[in-house]
C-alpha cells in the first residue's frame, strides 16, 4: 500500500467550485465529485477537514459594493458557507464518510460549535470535518479561514481546489497566453500579487510553514495525487 505524503490536510473549496458549470448555486455532480475523492483518500488513512466558501450563493464584498454595510454583507456570506457545508455533509455521508459540520457562528440545530480540541478529536476518530461560517468574523475571507484552521489543527498542507489547474501570471480563462507556475514561494505570491489567496491568508501560511497545493478540482484523482506528493497544479511553500 502506498504511503501518503500528508497525513492531515485541509481541503479548501471555493463556493464557485461547487457551482460547477452552472455558475451559481450548488451543482449535484460537484458534490459527488468531492465526496468520492475525499472518501478515496480517507481509505489511505488521511485525516481530512474541509473549508468551504460561499461565493456560489453570496459574496460579502459584492454586497458592500452595492452599498450594504460590509459587516452585514460578510455575515450573509458566512451563512452561505453553512448552506454549502450542509450540502457537502449530505453528499459525504451518502458516499459512506462519517462527517461533522463545525460552525464558527453557533447554530446548534444544524452544526456543532467550532471547538479546536473537538475538531481534532473528530479527525482522530476518522470523521471528515467541515468548517463552516468562516472565522466567524467579518472582513476575513474563507482563504484566511483555511490558513487559520490548518494552523490550529496542525494540518500538514492545504489543498486548494480551483476551476483551473494551478497558479498563472494572469487569468488563463481570459488570457490564452497566461504562464503557469509549477512552484512558488509565499513571498512570490505576496510580492507579485498573484491571485492564489489573499495576503492575510498567504502570510499566515508562510509564518506557520503550511504548504499550499493549488489544483483543478474537475480532474478526478487530483486530490489523491496531491496527498501522495505527486506533482499536480502549483506548489506554494516557504521555499521553492
Curated annotation (Swiss-Prot):
Coarse class of the protein's main subcellular location: cytoplasm
GO CC annotation, single: cytoplasm
Pathway entry: Pyrimidine metabolism; CTP biosynthesis via de novo pathway; UDP from UMP (UMPK route): step 1/1
Catalytic activity: UMP + ATP = UDP + ADP
Binding site for UMP: 54, 74, 135-142
Membrane spanning stretches: none
InterPro entries documented for this protein: AceGlu_kinase-like_sf, Asp/Glu/Uridylate_kinase, Uridylate_kinase, Uridylate_kinase_bac
A GO biological process held by the record: UDP biosynthetic process
Enzyme Commission code(s) on record: 2.7.4.22
Free-text activity regulation comment from the record: Allosterically activated by GTP. Inhibited by UTP.
Transferase in keyword set: yes
Pfam family, any one: AA_kinase
The UniProt record lists the keyword ATP-binding: yes
Keywords recorded for this protein, A-Z: Allosteric enzyme, ATP-binding, Cytoplasm, Kinase, Nucleotide-binding, Pyrimidine biosynthesis, Transferase
UniProt: ATP binding residues: 12-15, 55, 59, 168, 171
Subcellular location: Cytoplasm
SUBUNIT field: Homohexamer.
Family: Belongs to the UMP kinase family.
Function, as annotated: Catalyzes the reversible phosphorylation of UMP to UDP.
Full protein name: Uridylate kinase
Organism: Desulfitobacterium hafniense (strain Y51)
Recorded name of the encoding gene: pyrH
